[in-house]
UniProtKB/Swiss-Prot annotation:
Cytoplasm listed as a keyword: yes
Coiled coil: none
Molecular function terms from GO: peptidyl-tRNA hydrolase activity
Keywords tagged on the record: Cytoplasm, Hydrolase
Organism lineage string: Archaea, Methanobacteriati, Methanobacteriota, Stenosarchaea group, Methanomicrobia
Designated name of the protein: Peptidyl-tRNA hydrolase
Catalytically driven reaction(s): an N-acyl-L-alpha-aminoacyl-tRNA + H2O = an N-acyl-L-amino acid + a tRNA + H(+)
Sequence similarity: Belongs to the PTH2 family.
EC number of this enzyme: 3.1.1.29
InterPro entries: Pep_tRNA_hydro_II_dom_sf, Pept_tRNA_hydro_arch, PTH2
Function summary: The natural substrate for this enzyme may be peptidyl-tRNAs which drop off the ribosome during protein synthesis.
Pfam family, one: PTH2
HAMAP family with a match to the protein in the record: Pept_tRNA_hydro_arch
GO CC aspect terms: cytosol
Amino acid sequence: MSEYKQCIVTRDDLKLSKGKFAVQVAHAALSAAEWASKGDLEKWKEGGQKKIVLKVPSIKELYELKEKARREGLPTALIQDAGLTEIPPGTVTVLGIGPAKEELIDKITKDLKLV
């Protein structure tokens, strides 16, 4: 039986406070899950809602990763900040991928580093 997980990919070039970082990750987790198939979402929930937080150097790599995920048919959510506190409005902060089968997500995230 396949394992299911979700990855949240953050931009290492943005220096966010811990609170802002946590909120952006939460936005991505919820938003990406809304795009998952009902079956994948249920299997992910049953398996404990595994999440992994990874990082990329900049927005360029974040967009490239989103495109790879799209080509694989994975649910994604690219999060833009409202700009009310630390960063300018519209700043793209994180990318949520999944939940989906672990092997599908690993195919495109295997070379990324943990936060």
